[in-house]
Amino acid sequence: MPIIEQLGYLGLGVSDLEAWERFATHVLGLGVSRRADDGAFALRMDGHAHRFLVYPDPLDDLRFVGWQVADAAALDEASARLERAGTKVTRGTAEERADRAVRDLVKFTDPGGIPVELFHGPAMAKEPFRSDVVGSHFVADTMGLGHLVLSTRDRDACRDFYMEVFGFKLSDYIICDIGGYHVDVCFMHVNKRHHSLALGGPMPKRIHHFMLQVGAMDDVGLAYDRARDDGVVIENELGRHPNDRMFSFYAQTPSGFQFEFGWGGREIDDATWEPTTYHQISEWGHRRPPRRRPKT
């Protein structure tokens, strides 16, 4: 059984805080839960005090990933596993614990160069979350904020690291050629969500995309309309994946990496699950939108 329970939070470094706040609240439907003097802010979507930490930073990329474990004993065990695997582990400072609003955390860098934090005891919100634009709810809470797809220099080494050190379980692979690109992505899970982590090849940024799941199909369509109305660059139109069965679309965040907004994701029962390999990214849809040609 994985020692990690869920994808807890993402730390993002962004160059345009104002654009990110509008995007996160108006397009995605998240809520601002905290602001700092330097302009940084936190975003919530469920019972947790926050799921995203957004900092002023020209990086425009992922700064760190936070994975939740059950308690102090699990954090100590995870740290010991990392050290046995030859990975340097450092304890989070009091300032970092306060910023993340967690009881304790440790930090390390994974084989792909991604800064990772393990934590326990997240602060919970005092009031239920109600989105201003999402009519149903975000499928999060005990399944975590959603999923993320990371860039890796050595996909297999990263896959083995997460599976052997933390007990991540293999969901499946997608291997295919599309649009002149070779796609080879590994999907892994830590709870019943089909995947909380997917690993691809080298990409311009650390993160390819994060995914948020909602409780009603119409909320995906409404988010698609909001994104288009706000001038958000749509990367892939509405479609459905064959592996996790997610009905979704992809578009750009203000930082250039992507997000996926979906509904209907498959849940895994480890007692019966058999990993497989798919040879298409989508069963239907997820097409690149036509680009307007300049007038001559």
What are these regions (language model features)?
Residues M1-E18, L62-W67, A123-D156, K169-S171, ...:
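N-terminal beta-strand motif that seeds the catalytic metal site of vicinal oxygen chelate
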Residues Q6-S15, D57-R153, D184-M188, G231-T296, ...:
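Vicinal oxygen chelate
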Residues H48-L53, G113-V116, H194-L197, F257-Q258:
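Short, charged/polar, Gly/Pro-enriched secondary-structure boundary elements
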